[in-house]
UniProtKB/Swiss-Prot annotation:
Binding site for L-aspartate: E176, R220, S370, R374
Positions contributing to ATP binding: R220, A221, E222, R228, H229, L230, E367, G415, C416, E417, R418
Catalytic activity reported: tRNA(Asx) + L-aspartate + ATP = L-aspartyl-tRNA(Asx) + AMP + diphosphate
Source taxon at top rank: Archaea
Main enzyme class: ligase
InterPro entries recorded: Aa-tRNA-synt_II, aa-tRNA-synth_II, aa-tRNA-synth_II/BPL/LPL, Asp-tRNA_synthase_2, Asp/Asn-tRNA-synth_IIb, NA-bd_OB-fold, NA-bd_OB_tRNA
Name of the protein this chain belongs to: Aspartate--tRNA(Asp/Asn) ligase
Subcellular location: Cytoplasm
Organism: Methanosarcina acetivorans (strain ATCC 35395 / DSM 2834 / JCM 12185 / C2A)
Function comment: Aspartyl-tRNA synthetase with relaxed tRNA specificity since it is able to aspartylate not only its cognate tRNA(Asp) but also tRNA(Asn). Reaction proceeds in two steps: L-aspartate is first activated by ATP to form Asp-AMP and then transferred to the acceptor end of tRNA(Asp/Asn).
Cofactor details (free text): Binds 3 Mg(2+) cations per subunit. The strongest magnesium site (Mg1) is bound to the beta- and gamma-phosphates of ATP and four water molecules complete its coordination sphere.
Annotated family: Belongs to the class-II aminoacyl-tRNA synthetase family. Type 2 subfamily.
Residues given in the record as Mg(2+) 2 binding sites: E367, S370
Length: 444
């Protein structure tokens, strides 16, 4: 028997415009629920696309088939062949009248957690039994939307003449200095998991690639234990030659609007499952200077922000609420950050070097992206590396690219999980990644 015979349709594909009433089809999936009412038995089959009701009337079908259906165990895997009967009251608007039910695998009992939504489970319980949690409609919906967002990102970049790249994740030195690195043994040497593709993106600008993007993992050995931090995340990175920070901000805000548009158009069922209503953010996004942000925070908070401070969680919420109250929008930029609190490669303004040509793209609740025009002048770059207490010798492979014709360039990086989290309003970032890695979780 060919496994292809185990399914002819997904549950959501059975519609009057594509399937005839009475047509024989085969569905395959998991047993979501069995309801035995004596003379009639309902088996709810669930697959990736939704649910279908299999209806067995005792007087109308083979007794052996009816009795077997009553004994089915939830979450077992089955394949059901039968005829379609369109029925408005049934899930998805039809029911399947079975001729054959094949049990492909029997689920153990009791289940480690409920999949129907009748019994809530804590996040740690769900993650410990992720194989079951992924069967929940709400969990599936999040990852369908994440998939659509990533497809939209690639579509946008390809349309705008970007080249997709893949840079090393095992490196000999820190991308941005600091100690937030995971050391590994690389044969007889120490190496690290990469924090960011930043240095390699810039080398590609020197190589003439002009416009690049990457979607890939990054690793941060930070001991944060919050609802919005991960130690392994997916970063969406961009670098553009012959561009400044305003140019790449425009690319970023248009990308955000494009993602929202695609998700709204193509993920209606998943959004409905999650109870989320989206609107496309208006562009261009509001731009606030760092100095303006200080004024907003200090006018609304008892705890004052001083020049040179980073924007903490309270400040992010304060400014985010201000922007939402004044514009009705959740996304905005903070520009012109102090040079000393940005990475060494951020370009200072020529006429006021204490400020950098840098930005953060913010959501009402948190930072989503950081970017800047980069330093493309070799001597200035070396000076900035030294000013941050780093040794230029450790960046020789990177600095060499700036000695032989590096164009002006700019770029940014954005966390995929944070983006999905803020778009869907999920409470915890771990809900937006299949198998999260944080300081306490290394399995599954």
């Amino acid at each position: 028997m060919s496994l292809a015979n185990l399914r002819t349709h997904y549950t959501a594909e059975v519609k009057p415009e594509s399937v005839d009433n009475g047509q024989k089809i085969t569905l395959a999936g998991w047993i979501h629920e069995v309801r035995d009412l004596g003379g009639i038995c309902f088996v709810v089959l669930r697959d990736r696309e939704g649910k279908a009701q299999v209806t067995l009337v005792k007087k109308k079908i083979d007794k052996e088939l009816f009795d077997a259906a009553r004994r089915l165990i939830r979450e077992s895997v089955i394949s059901v062949t039968g005829s379609v009967k369109f029925e408005e009251k049934a899930p998805n608007g039809y029911e399947l009248l079975p001729e054959e039910i094949k049990v492909l695998n029997v689920a153990g009992s009791p289940l480690p957690m409920d999949t129907t939504g009748k019994v809530e489970a804590e996040l740690d319980t769900r993650l410990d039994s992720r194989f079951i949690d992924l069967r929940r409609a709400e969990t599936t919906a999040v990852f369908k939307i994440r998939h659509e967002a990533l497809q939209a990102i690639r579509e946008y970049f390809v349309k705008n003449k970007f080249i997709e790249t893949a840079t090393p994740k095992v490196v000999a030195t820190a991308t941005e200095g600091g100690t937030a690195l995971f050391p590994i043994t690389y044969f007889d040497r120490e190496a690290f998991l990469n924090q960011s593709p930043q240095l390699f993106k810039q080398i590609l600008m020197g190589g003439g690639f002009d416009r690049v993007f990457e979607i890939g993992p990054i690793f941060r050995a930070e001991e944060h234990d919050t609802r919005r931090h991960l130690n392994e995340a997916t970063s969406i990175d961009v670098e553009v030659s012959f561009a400044d920070h305003f140019d790449v901000m425009e690319i970023l805000e248009n990308l955000v609007a494009h993602i929202y548009t695609r998700v709204i158009e193509n993920c209606k069922a998943s959004l409905e499952i999650l109870g989320v209503e989206l609107k496309v953010p208006k562009t261009p996004f509001l731009k606030l200077t760092y100095d303006e942000v200080i004024e907003i925070v200090n006018s609304r908070c008892e705890e004052k922000m001083h020049w040179g401070d980073d924007l903490g969680t309270l400040g992010e919420h304060t400014v985010g609420n201000y922007v939402y109250e004044t514009t009705g929008e959740s996304h905005y930029f903070i520009i012109d950050w102090p040079t000393e609190i940005k990475p060494f490669y951020a370009m200072p303004y020529e006429d006021r070097p204490e400020f950098s040509k840098s930005f953060d793209m913010m959501h009402r609740t948190m930072e989503l992206s950081s970017g800047a025009q980069r330093i493309h002048i070799s001597e200035l770059l070396k000076s900035r590396i030294e000013s941050q207490g780093l040794n230029p010798d450790g960046f020789e492979f990177y600095l060499k690219a700036f000695e032989y014709g590096m164009p002006p360039h700019a770029g940014w990086g954005m966390g995929c999980e944070r983006f999905v989290m803020t778009m869907l309003g999920t409470e915890n970032i771990r809900d937006t990644v299949l198998f999260p890695r944080d300081r306490r979780r290394l399995s599954p």
